[in-house]
Every structure is written in structure tokens, then in C-alpha cells.
């Protein structure tokens, strides 16, 4: 009969054998703490909870209109070299679905269609755009919406930034106007 040589157990080995079940349970439970935030974002991205966290309302742009909403009701996020960005969602009116070619969003009045701002992407029922927020933006700035029709017509409207995103205005006031 052969004798089996066993190595003496170490403190770490004894600890692992005693607590491995509990540690594995923790590995399962810890991700559950993040589930409410995950389900909130899934409902937001899927559209179950509306266009965004904060609905701005209906904005009339020439003969057309759109519903505008902040995706997240929070200050702009730093997106690396692009700077601070703020995300908005929009939905075109039922009457203008076939008439609107493109919709743009920008802080400050656009000089021309070439500088119209960030283009909305997605279906006309739920479009999204991320607008760069310059640090030097003044508190009385306006958010300009430019809509281009298939017939070549272009219409613009503006709403105060304070109405479109109070969180961004608070963030700008905290930053202070820089020269």
C-alpha cells in the first residue's frame, strides 16, 4: 500500500477552504447592487420612460415642430479631446416626418447651414444629438434648432439654455465665465 504525502496547509489555504463559499456568494451579490441604475438606463434608451430624463417640451421651428428632451438631467460630461458634451433627444411632429431632411442643434446662432451644429441621428420618432458646450458659454446663451426640408427650405428657432438644460446653466455658473 502506498502512502500519500500531503503538504502542510498554509494559513491562506485554510482561509480559502473555510470562506470560499461566502466569497463566491459576494461575487454574485455585488453586481446586483448596480442593477437599478442599469434598468433605469435601459428604460431610458429604449424609450419606455420618454425621450429623456427631462422633457423640454414642444418647440415650433417654422412650419414644423419637435419635442425636445435632455437625455440625462446632469451637467455636461467631459468627452476627452472633444470637450464637454451634452446629449439631447428629439422627436419630430407627425405632420413633418416626410418633409424634414435634417435637424441640427447648436449653442449660439449658426452662421450658415455649414455651421448648423450637431446633427440629430436616428429615426424621426427618437433622434439623438450630442452638443459641445464651450466653457466660455454665457449664462444667457440660446440653444438653436435648425431644420432643413427636402425642398431646400431652412427654418430656425431658439430656446434659452436655461429652459433647455438648467443643470448645464448651473454648471456654467459654477465654472464662471472665462475670458
Segments (PLM) and residue ranges:
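Short acidic/polar inter-strand loop motif in beta-rich domains
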Residues: 149-156
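N-terminal Lys/Arg-rich, disordered targeting/topogenic segments
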Residues: 1-15
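Transition segment at domain starts
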Residues: 41-85, 116-120
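Extracytoplasmic/periplasmic/luminal assembly and interaction segments
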Residues: 67-113
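Hydrophobic membrane-insertion alpha-helices, especially the h-region
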Residues: 14-39
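Short, solvent-exposed, Trp/other aromatic-anchored flexible loops in extracytoplasmic proteins
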Residues: 120-144, 150
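Extracytoplasmic/periplasmic copper-protein system
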Residues: 54-58, 161-179
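Non-transmembrane interaction and regulatory regions of membrane-associated proteins
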Residues: 86-89, 101, 114, 120-125, ...
Amino acid at each position: 500500500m502506498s502512502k500519500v504525502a500531503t503538504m502542510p496547509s498554509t494559513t491562506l489555504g485554510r482561509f480559502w477552504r473555510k470562506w470560499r463559499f461566502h466569497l463566491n456568494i459576494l461575487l454574485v451579490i455585488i453586481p446586483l447592487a448596480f442593477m437599478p441604475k442599469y434598468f433605469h438606463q435601459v428604460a431610458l434608451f429604449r424609450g419606455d420612460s420618454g425621450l429623456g430624463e427631462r422633457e423640454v417640451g414642444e418647440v415650433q421651428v417654422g412650419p414644423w415642430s419637435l419635442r425636445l428632451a435632455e437625455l440625462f438631467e446632469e451637467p455636461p460630461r467631459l468627452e476627452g479631446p472633444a470637450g464637454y458634451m451634452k446629449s439631447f433627444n428629439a422627436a419630430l411632429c407627425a405632420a413633418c416626418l416626410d418633409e424634414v431632411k435634417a435637424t441640427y442643434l447648436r449653442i449660439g446662432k449658426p452662421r450658415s447651414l455649414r455651421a448648423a451644429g450637431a446633427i440629430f441621428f436616428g429615426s424621426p420618432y427618437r433622434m439623438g444629438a450630442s452638443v459641445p458646450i464651450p466653457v466660455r458659454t454665457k449664462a444667457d446663451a440660446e440653444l438653436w434648432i435648425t431644420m432643413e426640408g427636402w425642398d431646400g427650405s431652412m427654418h430656425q428657432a431658439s430656446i434659452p439654455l436655461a429652459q433647455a438644460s438648467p443643470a448645464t446653466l448651473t454648471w456654467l455658473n459654477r465654472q464662471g465665465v472665462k475670458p
